[in-house]
Amino acid sequence: MGVNNLSKPIIFCDFDGTVTANDNIIAIMKKFNPPGWETVKDQILDQSISIREGVAKMFSLLPVEAKDDIISYVLEQAEIREGFSDFVAYTKQQQLPLYIVSGGIDFFVYPLLEPFGPFDGIYCNSADFSGDTIKLVFPHGCDETCTSQGCGCCKPSVMRRIMSEQSTSIVIGDSITDLQAAKQADLVIARDFLIDKCEELGIAYEAFESFHDVTDILDAKLGVIS
């Protein structure tokens, strides 16, 4: 559905694999390679366990002693997707509310986004390093309306809290963690695995590779004149 005839667009943008070129959680797991993490990843992707349970399980395989090494590694290796800075500037220029809604973890989401902010809001999971292994905290869990009740950062619940009846939702994402949000969006801008799921389920989408593509899509859909 085109959004040019709808009012008050609000953008909900994923972080891992969307703002960043790679999925930072997967990058961490590949680098530190705790035994059993790949099995958990496959269970998340085939939806045999919830995203919340799976991501928590993966991080529980890592000792807290690795905290500094993990943080240093993820901040060094993360690559911001081409055009993101221009895209953020565009949303400010056009007065389009932009929320980052991420299944990622605060210790890398906030530092990586800091040069580009401020944003209208950043929603992500948190890490607790007080025990023997890394424990995840989920401050943005599912509301009563969520059908899965197993999200980590529940993107549809965040969207429902922010939107009014007059708002139009634009979801930008790449993975299984964006699927439930895509199902309720007025416009989906997708890449990678999310495209496969949209095609499988008959969800209309626009494809992107860089954030220059995203800006062009929004220009066309919203009828923005620069």
Where on the chain are the PLM-derived regions?
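Catalytic cores of large soluble enzymes that bind and process phosphate-bearing ligands
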Residues: T20, S50, E76, T147, ...
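C-terminal cap/substrate-recognition subdomain and adjoining C-terminal extension
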Residues: G83-P97, G104-S226
